[in-house]
Amino acid sequence: MDPEQEISNETLETILVSSTKGSNNNNKKMEEEMKKKVSRGELGGEAQNCPRCESPNTKFCYYNNYSLSQPRYFCKSCRRYWTKGGTLRNVPVGGGCRRNKRSSSSAFSKNNNNKSINFHTDPLQNPLITGMPPSSFGYDHSIDLNLAFATLQKHHLSSQATTPSFGFGGDLSIYGNSTNDVGIFGGQNGTYNNSLCYGFMSGNGNNNQNEIKMASTLGMSLEGNERKQENVNNNNNNSENPSKVFWGFPWQMTGDSAGVVPEIDPGRESWNGMVSSWNNGLLNTPLV
């Protein structure tokens, strides 16, 4: 083979290889440009008029399902989408439901505010307590908690001695006899002179037996804490031996107290235990 033919064959091969490489590069460039145009929406064609309002103020958005045959447009005047070759739907952008949700949320907040206001302003309504003044338990922002107890005690001092001490103003005995003028938790037949105090207090009944009642910190007499006093020497006459036993502790009634306030005997130096004998008698300790 001639050397000239060999050179010509080599040149042809190089030309073909270079041409194929160049064509491949051109194809890649074309594909990249097409992708860019598709992403920009330039292949959607010219700006089309809106099929609803016939406004030219439209723009290309995207292709449905990545199909070039279904370009989707948006009309800026009527603010609606449409797809070329598809059906028209009267659905605005965002829809009117979003505004409705905002209005409903604002109305809901207003209702909550009204409920909270009514909760603080409305007086306490209880079908069991009808004669109670609203200022006794009604919450007021301008009154402190300490002042609330002061007003409650002031209302008690202005009431009668035989009326219940919660300011109910009448015969209100839920657990006791309806004829007795006792507080809420009055339990036995007889008329007791109840009063509002903090600590221990006694009531005088028709059975002539002194009783000690436990009053809670809110001035409410507790039925479970009411226990009868019993003499240590098992004598029914209270004048012979005024020493009493209450919850296992010896108490002594002074002569000036007249059966109203129990006091601890200052002369007792030792308790001699909780269950020791006292004057040859057993201590009857009631369980609370």
Curated annotation (Swiss-Prot):
Record bears the keyword Nucleus: yes
PANTHER family assigned: DOF ZINC FINGER PROTEIN DOF1.4-RELATED (PTHR31992), DOF ZINC FINGER PROTEIN DOF2.1 (PTHR31992:SF335)
Expression across tissues: Accumulates in the stele.
Compartments reported by the entry: Nucleus
Mapped zinc finger ranges (Dof-type): 48-102
Any one Gene Ontology molecular-function term assigned to this protein's record: transcription cis-regulatory region binding
UniProt keyword annotation of Nucleus present: yes
Chain intervals with Low complexity compositional bias: 103-118
A GO CC term assigned to this protein in UniProt: nucleolus
Name the UniProt record assigns to this protein: Dof zinc finger protein DOF2.1
Binding site for Zn(2+): 50, 53, 75, 78
Region annotation (Disordered) ranges: 97-120
Keywords: DNA-binding, Metal-binding, Nucleus, Transcription, Transcription regulation, Zinc, Zinc-finger
One annotated GO biological process: regulation of DNA-templated transcription
Alphabetical list of InterPro entries matching this protein: Dof, Znf_Dof
